[in-house]
Amino acid sequence: MSARFPVVTGLGIIAATGINVDEIWNAIRTGTSGLKPLTLFQSPRYGQIPTGEISHDLVTLGAPTRGSRSDQLGWLAARDAIASAGIDLS
């Protein structure tokens, strides 16, 4: 039996430095940090620790309204990876 290797055909990412591959790649090239004060929830350590929070409204970006925030972030990244791969799911 021959070995089978995975192949990356598309990329999708959402992070504190950007909401797509181009924005994040630009942040890497320019040395832009995504660390900033926490805004999504209250914390007793507010202002003491910088956070890499994704503060965008995920539903506005096209995420489903159901599921956890982690589900929504994963869905957005997967959607971009599928589009980047040129796969049409319709």
What residue spans do the PLM features occupy?
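Conserved "HGTGT" condensation-loop signature of ketosynthase/thiolase-family condensing enzymes
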Residues: 1-90
